[in-house]
Structures are given as C-alpha cells and as structure tokens.
C-alpha cells in the first residue's frame, strides 16, 4: 500500500464521506482523520459495499501503538517521526469512531485497511462477520499448490520488499 488511511480511501470510493464535527468532508489522507466525527453515507454504493470481504495480509500488526501501522510501515512510505505520531493518533480516532479494537492482530496491515472495512461490514450487515482478515502468504500458497511445487523444485528463491524487524 502507499498510504496509512485506515481504509478510508476505499470507503470514499464506495461513497462514504469522512466528516468532521461540523459535517464538513475531511481532506483526503490519513492525517486528517484526527478530526473524524463520522461518515456521510448518503451516496454509499450499497451493492458494492455489502459484499463478503476477504483481506489477505502479510502482517499481524495492530492498528496503533509501537507495532502499529504508522510506527512500522509509515517510515517505509516516507513518514517522519512527526507524521508517525499524527497518523497513529488518526488511526486511534478512526478505531474509536468505527468501534474497532486497535489491538486486533492484522488490523495494521495495508495502512490500517481492515479498520474501515470492518466499519463498513458492520454498517451493512449489523456485525463484522462478513470481513475475513487472513494470512495472505498461506492462502496464496495453498491456492497454487506451493508445497508440492517446492517439493519438486531444484531451487527455491524468495524475496522481501524491505528487510526490517518484520522480516523473518
């Protein structure tokens, strides 16, 4: 991902507009979420929003805190320490408004994407049972029969986008 916005970019694309206390639309981007008071859903694309969501993640980071989306992945996207503090507070505000536990494993993935999608699923279905946050590597490996391919290979080469404390 290229942003830390808690999934609000997708929500906007689906017609949910983040708003401040005065009912004004927020500026795009994660930093403005510190001002979030709610969402205007008058233009929400209900058929597109009411789907079963399967989010494949490659991390188990929580949304906020020292291991959260802003702290761990913000620097990869060029965030300064000031940006990280702001983005962490913004994601905390989003979690509060969306009634999402910021310590949920995996909710820091993709810039906090599961936060917004959980809110959307709860809005559409009355609960969050229509969102599934799953380990992406395992799901992809199983879908392509990777264990069998590795077993029959002469050489296996893997890669990492950036070697950091998340790398194993």
Predicted regions located by residue number:
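N-terminal loops that bind phosphate or other acidic moieties
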Residues: 2-168
